Amino acid sequence: MKIVGCDLHARQQSIALLDTETGELMERTLDHEADQVREFYSSLTGPVVVGIEASGAMQWFLQLMEELEIECRVGHPAKIRAAETRKQKHDRRDALLALRLLLEKRFPTIWMPTTEQRDVRTLLRDRHQWVRMRTRVQSTLQAIALNHGLRKGKAL
């Protein structure tokens, strides 16, 4: 089994990978340019578990992990930070911390919606936004018509 601690950022990620069968530890930084991330994770054989800290720019990564059928655990940022005695942030150290918490079975996993649930939420949020926009336009047009003394029947 391969266990990966990952410190994910917008342009790159630092990883610490442990192969539990060989005991080999590998540390690496992956740029998010081209297909470097996809190539790296698709090259991993056997069962793989990846641990990342929750952040705003992680949806693409979760989709990639789901596509590659890799188990990805998302951790609570404050609880991950509380597990580290040193308060100094460092990408390499953060990746090693995530790896250590995964190995010790202390990784503070949070609940994440499934892809279907995320899609439904996005659809509902977008629909709500369009309905509000339509209402705003209707109200504006009504105000313009009333300001110009235009009425059509008793309704307006």
Region locations from a protein language model:
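A detector of single, family-specific signature residues
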Residues: 1-156
